[in-house]
Amino acid sequence: MNILYIGSSAAFSLIPFKKLLASAYSISAVGVYKPLIFEHKVIALENESLALSAQQHAIPVIDLSLPVAELIEQISLLDIDLILMSCYSRRLPDDLINLAKAGCFNMHPSLLPRYRGPEPVFWQMKQAAEMGVSWHLVTHDLDAGDIVKQQKIKLDDGLSFEEINRSLANTGAELMLAVLADLSAQRLLKTTQDQALASYYPYPEKDDFTVDTSGSAQRAYNFMRATQVFGHVYHCDSAQHHFLLDEAIDYDNNASQASVDVQGNRLYIPFNEGVLIATYTGKLSS
């Protein structure tokens, strides 16, 4: 089975790629948008790169930024059976999708059809949603193709964005091997996505970095920890005050207090359920 693997240098793409490398399946080529490649050199990968990792394993790398006609010509020569894709942020041309005789499949970090879009982890953590990973057929409409594998995961408190993505990627990598096994045995089941349950979320904007004291301190803590990588302050209203929060330190869902307590650079903020402990920027307004 000739496989074209398309992705980026994020963990959500690299982890399944490494799983595929260690499997019995063969990767015919890797597709990356504007890859960084060094000819005839051995590179120490301090920061991992999908393109360089492929190159070090003698796997051809295809530049997906090429004109579509040139891209189709290159990939047609590989006689691709299957395209596997993870963490690739651009829409694939329909002509490229159609080159894969056994189908083109994408790994998405949510329980589709919920949380379609480019940053599903952000929105799931903001809304304290049930987390999971899905493999689905790639169609012209983003994240809307038939689901072939899906699994829920449970996350510990306080995980970073990278830790969450690694957890999702590890689960997704195992599901990928199950997809390949089912394809080989001609037993792959496809489930049409229920459009009535579908939701789509765009890239988050600065106004989306808010924490709501009507919820639980645990929810706010996990959201802030997971999204700190975006580098935004968090807006929080409590009583008559507006706070600009910097970092979530801890929470106590069993604690109860009437008002915000300031201790040094830390705020103890009462929520409907529990107390959030967070640092703040020093700017408070009444």
Please describe what each predicted stretch is.
Residues M1-F230, H235, Q263-A278, G282-S285:
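One-carbon transfer enzymes
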Residues C236-D250:
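Short, structured protein-protein interaction patches enriched in aromatics and acidic/basic residues
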Residues E247-V262:
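A conserved acidic, glycine/proline-rich C-terminal tail/linker
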Residues T171, M176, H241, D252-N253:
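A ubiquitous, low-specificity "background" feature that marks scattered single residues
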